[in-house]
Amino acid sequence: GKRSPSGKLPVSFPKSVGQLPLFYSDRTSGRPGNDRYVSMDGQPLFPFGYGLSYTTFAFGKIHINKNSLSAGEKVTLHIPIKNIGDRDGVEVVQIYIQRQADKEGPVKTLRAFKRVEIPKGKTQEVKIELPYVAFEWFDPTTNTMRPIQGEYNILYGNSSRMKDLQSAKIQIQ
C-alpha cells in the first residue's frame, strides 16, 4: 500500500442489462416483454473515466486565457487540483467539450486528459492547451467534422459523470 492506484476505466459499466444496446439478430420468443429499460435512470454503474484511489482530490475553479477562439488559435486552461487526502496520489484530469446548440450529436466528447502526481496536502495547477480543432463537431450541411460557430462548454473533472464535472463557457468563432 505505499502507492495509490490511479487507473481509469476506458469504458462505462452498465448497472443492468437493460442499459445495453438492443440487437435484433435473434427472433423474438413471443413471450410478454418484461424489461425495465424504459424505467431506468440511464446512469451507468461505473462511468467512462472512473477510477479508485486511496486519496481524494478537489478540483478548483478553472482559469481560461480567452473567452473566444478563432481559427488557428488555441486556448490554455489552468486548473488547480488539491490532494485533500492522507497520501500522495495520481489524478487524471479529463477535459470534455459540449456543444450547447447540438441536440443530435454526443452529449460531450473527451478532447484532452493529463495525468498528474500530487503530494498529500499540496495543490498543483494543471495546464492543458486545446487547439481550435479540438472544437470540431459534425456538420450535417457539409458532412464533415469542423469547428462550428457558437457557445461550447468546457467540462473538466475526474470522470465522465456529470456530477464529477465542473464547467466553463467559450465562444467559437
Describe these PLM feature segments:
Residues 74-76, 123-127, 165-167:
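Intrinsic-disorder/low-complexity, polar/charged segments enriched in Ser/Thr/Lys/Arg/Asp/Glu/Gln
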Residues 131-173:
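Terminal connector regions
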Residues 1-90, 96, 149, 153-157, ...:
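Secreted, periplasmic, or luminal enzymes acting at the cell surface/secretory milieu
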Residues 58, 63, 80, 112-119, ...:
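Generic structural detector for well-ordered beta-strands
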Residues 102-140:
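Intrinsically disordered, low-complexity Pro/Gly/Ser/Thr-rich segments with frequent PxxP/GP/PP motifs
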Residues 86-103, 108-110:
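Short acidic, flexible loop segments centered on an aromatic residue
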